[in-house]
Structures are given as C-alpha cells and as structure tokens.
Amino acid sequence: MKPNFSKGLLPAVVIEEGTKEVLMLAYMNEEAYEKTLETKRTWFYSRSRRSLWNKGETSGNVQHVQSLYLDCDQDAIVVVVKQVGPACHTGEKTCFHYKII
C-alpha cells in the first residue's frame, strides 16, 4: 500500500518509538516520502521554502525511521522514529510543548 499524493502534500505525524510521544508534524510530498524510505531518515517538504529538507541535517538532531504507518484513506502518515536530540527547532524535546487545557 502506498500513500496517495494525488492531492499534493500529506501530513506526517512523527512519534518517538519507545514512548509514542508526538514529536512534530510536518508535510511530505512523494519525493520526501521516497527519500525517507531510501535513507531511513526523515525528509519533509517545506511549504514556506518550497523545497525538501532532511530533519537534523544542520542541527544534528536526526530522526532514524523505525516504521511508517498509513491511515485508512492513504492521505496521512505516522513516522515512528528514534530521535537524536530535541525534535523541535526551539530546543524542546517535542514541538507540542504548549499546553492549552
């Protein structure tokens, strides 16, 4: 089964393998998805820069892909990783560190 990229970018929810904690949300196009499969490291598509980026390429906070899950509509991906360092560019462990309720 493959993701359906016919409508463009797909959301990719990245979670930590051991804890299942949500680390970040990013977007993948087909090229980012294929590079992720090929390298076993996360690749995403930056909507603001309109280009691919490899998580941790400059910071060293890489994500080693352990598994990928596809939702029932084939239009969203869960990426299970072993995270090296913080996942968030702010230095926080997760991008979801602001509690609302």
UniProtKB/Swiss-Prot annotation:
Signal peptide as annotated in the record: none
Biological process terms in GO annotation: L-histidine biosynthetic process
Catalytic activity: 1-(5-phospho-beta-D-ribosyl)-5'-AMP + H2O = 1-(5-phospho-beta-D-ribosyl)-5-[(5-phospho-beta-D-ribosylamino)methylideneamino]imidazole-4-carboxamide
Pathway assigned in UniProt: Amino-acid biosynthesis; L-histidine biosynthesis; L-histidine from 5-phospho-alpha-D-ribose 1-diphosphate: step 3/9
Any one of the GO CC terms: cytoplasm
Family note: Belongs to the PRA-CH family.
Role summary: Catalyzes the hydrolysis of the adenine ring of phosphoribosyl-AMP.
Complex formation: Homodimer.
Name this polypeptide is given: Phosphoribosyl-AMP cyclohydrolase
Species assigned in the record: Bacillus cereus (strain Q1)
UniProt gene name: hisI
